[in-house]
Regions:
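Disordered, acidic Ser/Thr/Pro-rich linker "stalks" and the adjacent N-terminal cap
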Residues: 401-455, 464-473, 492-499, 532-541
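Short, surface-exposed beta-strand/strand-loop-strand elements in extracellular ectodomains
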Residues: 471-484
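Short, surface-exposed tryptophan/glycine-enriched loops
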Residues: 501-515
């Protein structure tokens, strides 16, 4: 008797759906590149935030996609909240969690962590549900999964490991292509919502080490993916990096388009002189020659002006491809007061419009932890203060600064001085920006005077010191009353002062009918300068 075969058990295999076309594209309008919505035909302006920190155990973590940390409900709440205020984009790091069993790559074998890919796919679904677009960025090759190990094979000697190898050597190109291939095929298998991807960012910030080989070499020939270069020739060394990065971009873009044919590809850059002079970045040749669809430049208010950033990037007058300001924000150690930070941010963005930027992603939605030295104001600090203030609903045109209420009677008032350096004009003392300063460019005696453009009852005068070296100083606070010919001295500061000190004069009784303030420095070991002069009070009756 023939045995009856066991019943066949059907195995359910998820059906892979046709891949959706990316909704955001790029077009040229009157020789000016711009993003646009392929469905509506309307111009698209990226406005949103870096979604890089999330709450965890009473603090914040920078691994929002980590298995065990990723919160589908929180992600949907945040994306919906952003959309409700008119924002349309977020920037998310794919691999800030790069080492460990709950991170992007497998620990014990090559490839990526399936559970982590599930989280990426769910975030894309959340974005589709909310109507938000995601710019996914890679910080680096993961430590696990075999990617970094392959990229570093054969490094040493003419090539230091890590970044100086990652962008110039064939093993690294192969490893990085495999990384992007694994990400994209994994998301295709999960029927991910590719249409919500604004772009794939090859690197959060591209840079190399000046003080490591091959950039540190002063002689000899070096072989890279793009040829042989003489390290004794600075121009060949620069060409080596430019050629190498252009080739790297072309290779990664080709890999991405194999699996995601309508994708946009970008890369992030910053000006290294701000934080790391030994890091090398050059973008002018990439603007001209690379296959990137758009560029992401990062610039924060501080010691370096936005104009200086733009000149360093080589983007003045550039219109061939869109450029977004993918990171900007106000550092709390520089801008400790909320209103000052808000004013600096809104003016920084307005200036960026004039200099050629086409999109804006604030750093960051949630703040970094309080112990992080260079943290910025988060959009949700306070009671979502900046999130609402800078939202498209409150500020439809990001190029028009938001009006920030202030109590400083000296803010942006006419000012004159005994003398001023060309790059430290007197107006910098009343711009409500503690990073800029008026500088006389000479020793005492020097003065600066502010026309209040009205008659006021003055209750407080505050001076933010710009001084090096520290030492004993004498400063006279003088006022001119309505109807008076000259100035009257109402207070004298005398004592030890140093840079960033605040000198505060609060008269026992308000000074009535004041129309002008003058600060006269009598003695100082430093050239005379002030970062800020603030005047508090009210209109005279």
């Amino acid at each position: 008797m023939q045995a009856t075969p066991p019943p066949v058990t059907a195995t359910l295999v998820p059906e892979t759906q046709p891949q959706a076309e990316h909704r955001i594209g790029i077009r040229l309008v009157n020789d000016q590149a711009e993003f646009f919505d392929k469905h509506s035909g309307e111009k698209f302006t990226p406005r949103g935030a870096n979604y890089v920190f999330v709450p965890e155990n009473g603090a914040f973590t920078n691994t929002p996609l980590r298995v065990g940390t990723y919160d589908p409900q929180l992600t949907r709440q945040v994306f919906s909240h952003l959309k409700g205020l008119g924002y349309n984009s977020v920037r998310v790091f794919l691999d800030s969690c790069s080492r460990g069993p709950n991170c992007i790559a497998n620990v014990t074998k090559p490839g990526l962590n399936p559970a982590y890919l599930d989280n990426i796919a769910d975030m894309m679904l959340a974005a589709r549900e909310a109507g938000i677009y995601i710019l996914f960025t890679s910080n680096d090759l993961p430590d696990d999964g075999g990617y970094s190990a392959e990229a570093n094979l054969g490094s040493g000697g003419d090539f230091a490991g890590y970044r100086n190898s990652f962008y110039l050597r064939p093993q690294a190109i192969s490893a990085t292509r495999r990384y992007w291939r694994d990400i994209l095929t994994g998301l295709v298998e999960r029927n991910a919502a590719f249409e919500v991807v604004l772009g794939w960012q090859l690197l959060n910030e591209q840079w190399m080490f000046r003080d490591q080989p091959p950039l540190s070499l002063t002689n000899g020939l070096v072989e890279t993916t793009t040829g042989s270069y003489d390290m004794g020739d600075p121009q060949q060394k620069q060409k080596m990096v430019s050629d190498g990065i252009i080739y790297y971009i072309a290779q990664m873009k080709a890999e991405i388009l194999r699996h995601d044919p309508t994708a946009l590809v970008t890369m992030g850059f910053f000006v290294p002189e701000l934080v790391a002079p030994d890091w090398y970045v050059e973008t002018s040749s990439l603007l001209e020659k690379s296959d990137l669809d758009f560029f992401d430049f990062h610039a924060y208010p501080g010691d370096l002006s936005l104009q200086a950033h733009v000149e360093a990037f080589g983007m003045l007058g550039y219109t061939a491809k869109p450029i977004i300001l993918g990171e900007y924000g106000a550092f709390r150690h520089l801008y400790a007061e909320r209103d000052t930070a808000a004013r600096v941010i809104t003016n920084w963005v307005a200036d960026s419009c004039e200099l050629g930027f086409d999109g804006w992603l604030y750093w960051s939605y949630y703040p970094a932890n309080a112990w992080i030295g260079d943290r910025t104001w988060g959009l949700v600090d306070g009671n979502d203060d900046f999130l609402e203030l800078f939202s498209p609903h409150n500020q439809p045109d990001i190029c028009v600064p938001v009006e920030i209420p202030h109590a400083n009677l000296a803010y942006n008032k006419p000012v004159r001085a005994s003398r001023s350096l060309p790059d430290e004009p007197a107006r910098f003392a009343v711009d409500d920006d503690p990073v800029t300063q008026w500088g006389a460019g000479d020793a005492p005696v020097q003065w600066i005077a502010i026309d209040l453009e009205g008659s006021y009852r003055i209750t407080e005068i505050r001076l933010l010191v710009a001084q090096w070296p520290a030492g004993k100083t004498v400063h006279r606070v003088q006022v001119r009353y309505a109807g008076a010919e000259g100035f009257a001295t109402v207070h004298e500061f005398s004592g030890m002062t140093g840079d960033q000190d605040w000198l505060v004069f609060a008269p026992p009784e308000a000074l009535e009918n004041v129309i002008e303030i003058r600060i006269q420095t009598i003695s100082s070991p430093s050239w005379v300068a002030w970062k800020e002069i603030q005047v508090k009070g009210e209109s005279a009756p």
